[in-house]
């Protein structure tokens, strides 16, 4: 695996972080759940929510969303009542 600015290349896949939208939360061990735009294997960028290590050298499992999916998620979240259950 080789690191390059904004991404990583290895035999299986490579990615490039094209934008960091923000951090949703940070755990006690320093890992943070972040929303980023990422290009996977040279494909068009998608929205990505996943955990990242403090130095951003490791990533956890996450979910990758198209623009249509992130818009649908935004609309769904905006329609929710966040009052206590």
Swiss-Prot record:
This is Uncharacterized protein TP_0352. One of its GO terms (molecular function) is DNA binding. GO terms for biological process: regulation of DNA-templated transcription. InterPro entries: PC4-like (IPR017154), PC4_C (IPR003173).
């Amino acid at each position: 695996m080789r690191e390059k600015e904004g991404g990583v290349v290895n035999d299986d896949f490579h990615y490039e972080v094209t934008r960091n939208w923000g951090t949703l939360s940070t755990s006690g061990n320093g890992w943070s759940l972040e929303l980023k735009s990422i290009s996977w294997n040279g494909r068009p960028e998608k929205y990505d929510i996943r955990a990242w290590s403090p130095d951003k050298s490791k990533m956890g499992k996450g979910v990758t969303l198209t623009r249509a999916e992130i818009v649908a998620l935004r609309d769904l979240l905006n329609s929710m009542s966040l009052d206590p259950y």
